[in-house]
């Protein structure tokens, strides 16, 4: 079996850029979310939209911790320079981060829908938002389920020597459906502004 040589750009890492961006963006999210919740609690106006965004923020902080473990394990470096154990650890922590990602996106989108519903509950708008929330739950749950069942045992996701996994194309198709739902909801939220809907 032919062994691939070292990558032309050498033993470099993009992990540092990744973890810095993740930390900065999570910090901004934490500050703005804390300010929002502080105002809502002070004015005794907290609602379900606040609860869902708070849960998303908590999971985001936990996800950042696991992203740090990813970085420590060598994520962002060429696999050529990683030992087998280190490479497996990088994939393992990536798996944990992925399981949180879909939940965080789902909770954030639901929070936006619930926030709009607090402002205006026009008949057509209400049903569109309920449909978006249902679609978001379904398309977020699907990749989560596949992440847990595509490899048996689950550990074989990062250690392919101990089990079997489904074809990756199945997971990819579901993830594309998820991002299709995210894009659809984003277009709708932007459309509300562009069409100057009186909220």
Please tell me what each predicted stretch does.
Residues 1-199:
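Extracytosolic/lumenal membrane-interface segments
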């Amino acid at each position: 079996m032919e062994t691939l040589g070292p990558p032309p750009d050498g033993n470099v890492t993009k992990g540092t850029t990744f973890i810095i961006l993740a930390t900065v963006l999570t910090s901004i999210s934490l500050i703005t979310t804390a300010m929002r919740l502080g105002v809502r609690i002070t004015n005794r106006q907290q609602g379900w939209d606040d609860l869902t965004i708070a849960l998303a923020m908590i999971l985001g902080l936990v996800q950042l911790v696991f992203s740090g473990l990813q970085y420590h394990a060598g994520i962002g470096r060429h696999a050529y320079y990683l030992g087998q154990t280190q490479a497996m650890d990088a994939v393992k922590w990536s798996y944990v981060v992925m399981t949180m990602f879909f939940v965080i996106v789902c909770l954030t989108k639901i929070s936006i829908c619930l926030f709009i519903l607090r402002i205006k509950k026009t008949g057509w708008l209400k049903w569109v938002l309920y449909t978006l929330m249902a679609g978001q739950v379904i398309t977020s749950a699907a990749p989560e389920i596949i992440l847990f069942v595509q490899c048996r045992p689950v550990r074989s996701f990062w250690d392919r020597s101990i089990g079997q996994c489904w074809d990756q194309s199945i997971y990819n198709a579901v993830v594309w459906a998820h991002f299709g739902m995210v894009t659809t909801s984003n277009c709708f939220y932007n459309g509300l502004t562009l069409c100057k809907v009186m909220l």
